[in-house]
């Protein structure tokens, strides 16, 4: 081991010895660190040392990896908890920013000063007083349990003291104590334990009685320990004595109680509310009596004044917090009005954001979507989704119009009238939801309206205006078309079987080959007679038919049969069983006054009269029921006058009660019928013509004159068709992915189709078009032609609108582009007119303009670009010097005619600010410049 052993440890060394590595492995010489070891044992020791160092390094790395994994798990858990919806973000407590502002770590504020103590003695308002929170059911349960435990503890306190004494005697007994005493003490202790256990096991109803003494309850301990300081002693004690005490009556107020309360309060002998509660004799507190009288008894329905409306609007603005109005505070500031009254008045009348009047189709669509999302329960969220409508409007619209069941009928029979009056007797007036349980085919709104109609009918009968049958019929609306058709079907099914069989036998005798049953025969005959019945109903709706009907009624009145007499007697009995109170009469009178006031204060009355005065009278007698017609030869002013006068006449006629009733019963169904017929004609009949034209064009016998599609074969764009077009555009990407299983996109060539994989199919969006090739058997079929024609009729105009309408992003790009072009044009115009002075060149006094550059290019010019290229690329200077050594290349080109593109490019280059050349000792060597444009035109200018 006399030779020198070299060991290369890497970075850690003890002695630096320069050596040369193998020449075959390294191309250059390197100096490395080495260890000098004279013996093999020394080399092994060094090796073991490095092994230990490596092991410790591996352990350290492993420990760091474990720590990293643990930290990753912690971060994942924190991220999961952060994204959980049920864990709310921690917020700063609000009480930190509320008085008192000077608090220590325990939220304790300094003692009161002399001024504060004086204000407290004088009963001044305490600004530190907090508003009482509403009691929750859990807090009420805690209070009852605490009071019960306090009463039980006070009751068993003497027994517990005696128990402790007897127990101490038993513990202290010794040999001097007789067995008799021990036995007596043991029996007494067991008796005390039984009494204590019995009292402690009593229920709340047995302990919390009206005769219990609640003065022994430690209210301070309950407020501090049981409620942990969240309620004050005064709040806990007041809650128990004024509300939760069992001696107070908490049942619903009966009618006798309300009447007696009203009498005692309005009596001149009224002194105070405690005396009134004592005289009432129903175990009501003074606060209960005052609250009942202020909120319900004295709150009769009175008109809102202008001052009240102004005050209510101001209060809603003051008490509004983040869009939510505190109606309790508003009601407190409005004496004589309840919370529901002020809320209803503001939301239904005074709220400027709430829209009134007829519902549009767009609002109905929003309402249906909101109900499908939130359900027909949370009407506040539904109203927020619909916008400009309150919750009651949304509920009424959904319940009475959009979601009205097909079996709900507006008309009431005599049996249903009896059921309604019985339900009112059972449940009382106003409980229409409960009354609906007895009449499931009627809505609560229909029951209320029918009850008011019965009251009005009895008043008319008592006044002698009509008989009982006419009084019962008044107020009912005219039946709709679908209801009349349903009645025809029911009446047809109720035809006696004998008559049906007789007609069938006569018809079968004349036609022996008849294979129909009597039921099938009669159904076929009834189906043929239904259009005639509809025409007869339409005839009855005409005004001329009323005269004939009146004459027939006179004849029928003279010869009235017994059934009608019984019906009139039955109607009289129903009206006689109806009890009308003074409140009902007062309500009907106020309701009529309200309707009259609304009629006189209608919105368009003044405007219509003013417009009618400004319009020049025309010589045409207009009928509100007829549409205005024009003569093509009339002037445009005359046509405008006709339109304005017809609109004014329609509004005036609509204000008339008789014509308005006729409109709501008959004419309002005309427009939907016309629209339905128009759509059916366009989608079905016109589509057939388009389908025939499509098949004719695809056939071989098509001429050049047959290429044009039939005119007026598309529907006008509507909200429904436009929404359908939007829905199809949204679903286009999914449809493209479905069709990609069988077809390829148009931008995929035949050679690329082999490499078109599933990933590319899944990435298809709605902007790419598919190359869908259908067979001639499909495209030439009538079904495909009809489908094409109907889709064309519905979606052609919405597609044109979608193409013609510019998107917001495209509009922004276009405006930016136009502004840039205008700015560039203005700048070029100013430069041309020498309104903008370019930066002066360092070597001469010449100003560069597009005109001067064009003149120099036509005559030849000198441009030195050496320094310019050197500034743009540092390597270019080296290349230029290398080229100079080889030789200078010059190209003598005389430019006489330049294309317009080159001139524009040169003008753009000239418009840029010139760079000053670098200072050099000698004259720069001439070179060449290349100007590359977008059209790849290279321009080389000779430099003299």
Curated annotation (Swiss-Prot):
Signal peptide: none annotated. This is snRNA-activating protein complex subunit 4 homolog. It comes from the Eukaryota. Disruption phenotype: RNAi-mediated knockdown from larval stage L1 results in decreased 21U-RNA expression and disrupted distribution of prde-1 foci within the nuclei of germ cells. Coiled coil: none annotated. Residues 11-22, 922-935 have a biased composition (Polar residues). Gene3D superfamilies: Homeodomain-like. Residues 177-244, 304-350 form the Myb-like domain. Broadly expressed in all tissues, including head, vulva and tail. GO terms for molecular function: RNA polymerase III type 3 promoter sequence-specific DNA binding. Residues 245-301, 351-406, 407-459 form the HTH myb-type domain. It is found in: Nucleus. One of its GO terms (biological process) is snRNA transcription by RNA polymerase II. Binds to the promoter regions of RNA polymerase II and III small-nuclear RNA genes, type 3 RNA polymerase III non-coding RNA genes, small nucleolar RNAs and transfer RNA genes. Required for expression of mature 21U-RNAs. Residues 911-921 have a biased composition (Low complexity). Keywords: DNA-binding, Nucleus, Repeat, Transcription, Transcription regulation. PANTHER family: SNRNA-ACTIVATING PROTEIN COMPLEX SUBUNIT 4. PROSITE patterns: HTH_MYB, MYB_LIKE. GO terms for cellular component: nucleus; snRNA-activating protein complex. It comes from Caenorhabditis elegans.
């Amino acid at each position: 081991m006399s030779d020198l052993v070299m060991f290369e440890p890497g970075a850690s060394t003890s002695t630096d010895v320069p050596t040369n590595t193998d020449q075959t492995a390294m191309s250059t010489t390197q100096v490395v660190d080495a260890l000098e070891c004279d013996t093999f044992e020394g080399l092994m020791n060094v090796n073991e040392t490095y092994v230990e160092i490596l092991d410790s390094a591996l352990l350290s790395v492993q420990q760091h990896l474990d720590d990293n994994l643990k930290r990753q798990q912690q971060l994942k858990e924190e991220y999961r908890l952060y994204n959980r919806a049920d864990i709310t973000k921690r917020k700063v407590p609000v009480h930190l920013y509320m008085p008192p502002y000077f608090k220590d770590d325990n939220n304790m504020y300094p003692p009161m000063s002399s001024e504060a103590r004086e204000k407290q003695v004088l009963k001044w308002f305490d600004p530190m007083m907090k508003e009482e929170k509403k009691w929750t059911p859990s807090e009420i349960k805690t209070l009852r349990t605490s009071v019960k435990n306090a009463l039980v503890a006070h009751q068993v306190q003497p027994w517990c003291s005696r128990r402790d004494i007897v127990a101490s005697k038993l513990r202290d007994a010794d040999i001097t104590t007789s067995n008799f005493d021990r036995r007596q003490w043991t029996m007494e202790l067991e008796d005390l334990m039984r009494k204590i256990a019995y009292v402690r096991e009593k229920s709340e109803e047995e302990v919390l009685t009206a005769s219990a003494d609640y003065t022994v309850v430690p209210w301070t301990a309950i407020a501090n320990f049981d409620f942990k300081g969240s309620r004050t002693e005064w709040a806990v004690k007041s809650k128990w004595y004024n509300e939760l005490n069992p001696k107070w009556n908490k049942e619903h107020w009966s009618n006798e109680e309300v009447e007696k309360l009203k009498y005692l309060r309005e009596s001149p002998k009224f002194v105070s509310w405690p005396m009134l509660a004592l005289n009432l004799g129903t175990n009501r507190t003074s606060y209960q009596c005052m609250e009942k009288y202020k909120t319900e008894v004295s709150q009769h329905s009175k008109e809102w004044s202008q001052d009240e409306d102004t005050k209510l609007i101001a209060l809603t603005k003051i008490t509004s917090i983040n869009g939510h109005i505190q109606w309790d505070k508003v009601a407190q500031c409005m004496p004589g009005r309840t919370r529901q009254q002020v809320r209803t008045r503001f939301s239904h009348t005074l709220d400027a954001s709430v829209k009134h009047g007829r519902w549009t189709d767009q609002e109905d669509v929003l309402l249906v979507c909101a109900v499908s999302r939130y359900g027909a329960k949370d009407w506040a969220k539904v109203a927020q989704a619909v916008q400009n409508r309150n919750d009651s409007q949304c509920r009424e619209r959904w319940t009475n119009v959009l979601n009205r069941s097909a079996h709900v009928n507006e008309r009431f029979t005599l049996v249903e009238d009896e059921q309604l009056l019985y339900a009112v007797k059972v449940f009382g007036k106003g409980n229409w939801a409960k009354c609906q349980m007895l009449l499931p085919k009627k809505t609560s709104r229909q029951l209320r309206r029918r009850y008011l109609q019965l009251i009005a009918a009895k008043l008319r009968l008592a006044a002698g205006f009509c008989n009982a049958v006419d009084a019962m019929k008044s107020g009912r609306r005219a039946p709709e078309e679908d209801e009349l058709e349903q009645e025809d079907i029911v009446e047809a099914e109720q035809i006696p079987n004998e008559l049906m069989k007789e007609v069938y036998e006569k018809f079968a005798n004349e036609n022996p080959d008849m294979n129909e049953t009597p039921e099938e025969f009669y159904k076929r005959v009834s189906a043929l007679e239904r259009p005639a019945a509809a025409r007869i109903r339409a005839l009855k709706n005409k005004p001329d038919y009323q005269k004939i009907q009146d004459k027939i009624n006179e004849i029928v009145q003279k010869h009235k049969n017994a059934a009608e007499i019984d019906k009139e007697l039955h109607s009289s009995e129903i009206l006689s069983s109806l009890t009308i109170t003074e409140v009902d009469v007062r309500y009907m009178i106020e309701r009529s006054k309200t309707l009259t006031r609304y009629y006189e204060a209608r919105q368009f009355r003044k405007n219509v009269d003013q417009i009618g005065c400004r319009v020049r009278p025309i010589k045409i007698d207009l009928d509100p029921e007829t549409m205005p017609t024009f003569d093509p030869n009339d002037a445009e002013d005359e046509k405008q006058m006709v339109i304005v006068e017809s609109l004014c006449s329609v509004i005036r006629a609509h204000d008339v009660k008789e014509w308005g009733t006729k409109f709501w019963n008959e004419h309002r169904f005309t427009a939907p019928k016309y629209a339905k017929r128009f759509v059916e004609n366009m989608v079905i009949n016109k589509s057939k013509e388009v389908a025939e034209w499509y098949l004719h064009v695809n056939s071989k016998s098509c001429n050049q004159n047959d290429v044009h599609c039939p005119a007026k074969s598309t529907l006008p764009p509507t909200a429904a068709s436009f929404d359908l077009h939007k829905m199809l555009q949204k679903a286009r990407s999914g449809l493209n992915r479905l069709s990609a299983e069988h077809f390829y996109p148009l931008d995929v060539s035949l050679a690329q189709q082999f490499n078109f994989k599933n990933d590319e199919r899944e990435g298809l969006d709605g902007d790419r078009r598919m190359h869908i090739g259908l067979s001639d058997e499909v495209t030439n079929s009538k079904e495909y032609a009809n489908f094409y024609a109907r889709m064309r009729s519905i979606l052609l105009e919405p597609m044109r609108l979608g193409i013609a309408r510019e998107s917001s992003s495209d509009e922004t790009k276009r405006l930016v582009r136009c502004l840039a072009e205008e700015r560039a044009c203005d700048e070029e115009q100013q430069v041309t007119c020498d309104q903008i002075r370019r930066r002066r060149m360092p070597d001469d006094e010449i100003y560069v303009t597009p005109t001067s550059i064009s003149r120099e290019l036509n005559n030849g010019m000198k441009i030195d670009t050496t320094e310019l290229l050197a500034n743009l690329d540092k390597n270019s200077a080296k290349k230029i010097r290398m080229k100079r050594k080889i030789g200078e290349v010059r190209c003598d080109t005389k430019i006489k005619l330049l294309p317009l593109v080159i001139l524009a490019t040169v003008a753009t280059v000239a418009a840029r600010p010139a760079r000053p050349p670098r200072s050099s000792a000698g004259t720069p060597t001439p070179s060449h410049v290349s100007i590359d444009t977008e059209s790849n035109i290279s321009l080389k200018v000779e430099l003299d």
